[in-house]
């Protein structure tokens, strides 16, 4: 029995010693396992093609004072005042057309007025950049004080199908200015501008008339823009005629103070920009500013303004005049203005 007890005691002692050695062994292996796991994770991340994909570039942040929520109306809740003098507002007035009608000249003339703050470049928000959102659009605008008017001009709006609906969604009270010009001379001026950038352009005849000999090709944008009545018809589905002012591109050259005076009246502004601000540059055939905004010297518009037009045979000019005549007459009826284009 004693032997059995001894044997039992020896076995128990051996098991206790073995358990102690196993625990010690496991304890000694733990740091090694931890090191192996860390090294394994590092190797996985360091192997080519195994790193996490690079984070996408963040979307352009809005201007510091802009809210992150979407905006649907000027002055809507959640649009805090911008820091600094004044605040950025949605435009109360837009020069929406037309290309090569005199929009740049009108904008520069209006910028002489102390109560007009205008964006210098064309933002193309309502035709090309609408997906960026109204908060982004407002962040582009200059700061204005109470009583000042924010403006921008993008002449392609007038011929953009979606523009009237989008502008109405921003504000149904927006005032719309359209500078129009004889559609024949406008088309030739449009062609001259394109030709200056694309020397290998086909002839005016080849573009304006199908196969150079057939009927007028309204698929060519230079021709299609001049169908003012058709474009206006679409705009009138969203805005009443009282929201429009139609400025004569021809009178903007011959009597800039008179046309700018009409615009100031339309915007509810005092007539500050007058004859004293203009002089006629015989070389360019254009009115120039005696004192440009922010300057003390006279200034004419850019070199591209008043560029010579290519010679177009009179027979082609007459065909275009005949083509546009019914559209012009309808435009006169719609606007209540006779622009004298025939």
From Swiss-Prot:
EC annotation from Swiss-Prot or TrEMBL: 2.8.2.23
Composition skew (Low complexity), residue ranges: 66-85
A Gene Ontology biological process term: blastocyst hatching
Keywords, comma-separated and alphabetical: Disulfide bond, Glycoprotein, Golgi apparatus, Membrane, Signal-anchor, Transferase, Transmembrane, Transmembrane helix
Domain of life: Eukaryota
Entries under InterPro entries matching the protein: NST/OST, P-loop_NTPase, Sulfotransferase_dom
Compartment annotation: Golgi apparatus membrane
Disulfide bonds: 288-300
Class of this enzyme: transferase
Positions annotated to bind 3'-phosphoadenylyl sulfate: 100-104, 181, 189, 305-309
Annotated stretches, region: Disordered: 1-21, 55-85
GO MF terms held by the record: [heparan sulfate]-glucosamine 3-sulfotransferase activity
Catalytic activity: alpha-D-glucosaminyl-[heparan sulfate](n) + 3'-phosphoadenylyl sulfate = 3-sulfo-alpha-D-glucosaminyl-[heparan sulfate](n) + adenosine 3',5'-bisphosphate + H(+)
Spans through the membrane: 32-49
Residue ranges annotated as Lumenal topological domain: 50-342
Claim: Signal is one of the keywords in the record: no
Main localization category: Golgi
Family note: Belongs to the sulfotransferase 1 family.
Stated role: Sulfotransferase that utilizes 3'-phospho-5'-adenylyl sulfate (PAPS) to catalyze the transfer of a sulfo group to heparan sulfate. The substrate-specific O-sulfation generates an enzyme-modified heparan sulfate which acts as a binding receptor to Herpes Simplex Virus-1 (HSV-1) and permits its entry. Unlike 3-OST-1, does not convert non-anticoagulant heparan sulfate to anticoagulant heparan sulfate.
Stated name of the protein: Heparan sulfate glucosamine 3-O-sulfotransferase 6
Organism: Homo sapiens
């Amino acid at each position: 029995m004693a032997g059995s007890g001894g044997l039992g005691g020896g076995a128990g002692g051996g098991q206790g010693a073995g358990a102690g050695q196993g625990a010690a062994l496991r304890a000694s292996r733990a740091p090694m396992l931890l090191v192996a796991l860390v090294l394994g994770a590092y190797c996985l991340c360091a192997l080519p093609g195994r790193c996490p994909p690079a984070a996408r570039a963040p979307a352009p942040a809005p201007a510091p004072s802009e809210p992150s929520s979407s905006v649907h109306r000027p002055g809507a809740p959640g649009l805090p005042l911008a820091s600094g003098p004044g605040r950025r507002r949605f435009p109360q007035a837009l020069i929406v057309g037309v290309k090569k009608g005199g929009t740049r000249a009108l904008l520069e003339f209006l910028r002489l007025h102390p109560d007009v703050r205008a964006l210098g470049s064309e933002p193309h928000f309502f035709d090309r950049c609408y997906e960026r959102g109204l908060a982004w659009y407002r962040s582009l605008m200059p700061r204005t004080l109470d009583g000042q008017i924010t403006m921008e001009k993008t002449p392609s709006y007038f011929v953009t199908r979606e523009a009237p609906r989008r502008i109405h969604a921003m504000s149904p009270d927006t005032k719309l200015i359209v500078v129009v010009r004889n559609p024949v001379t406008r088309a030739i001026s449009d062609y001259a501008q394109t030709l200056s950038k694309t020397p290998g352009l086909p002839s005016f005849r080849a573009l304006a008339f199908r196969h150079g000999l057939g009927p007028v090709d309204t698929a060519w944008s230079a021709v299609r823009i001049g169908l003012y009545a058709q474009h206006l018809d679409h705009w009138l589905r969203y805005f009443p005629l009282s929201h429009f002012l139609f400025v004569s591109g021809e009178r903007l050259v011959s009597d800039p103070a008179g046309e700018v005076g009409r615009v100031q009246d339309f915007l509810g502004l005092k007539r500050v920009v007058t004859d004293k601000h203009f002089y006629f540059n015989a070389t360019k055939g254009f009115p120039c500013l005696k004192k440009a905004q922010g300057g003390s010297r006279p200034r004419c518009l850019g070199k591209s303004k008043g560029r010579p037009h290519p010679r177009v045979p009179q027979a082609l000019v007459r065909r275009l005049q005949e083509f546009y005549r019914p559209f012009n007459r309808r435009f006169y009826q719609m606007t209540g203005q006779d622009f004298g284009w025939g």
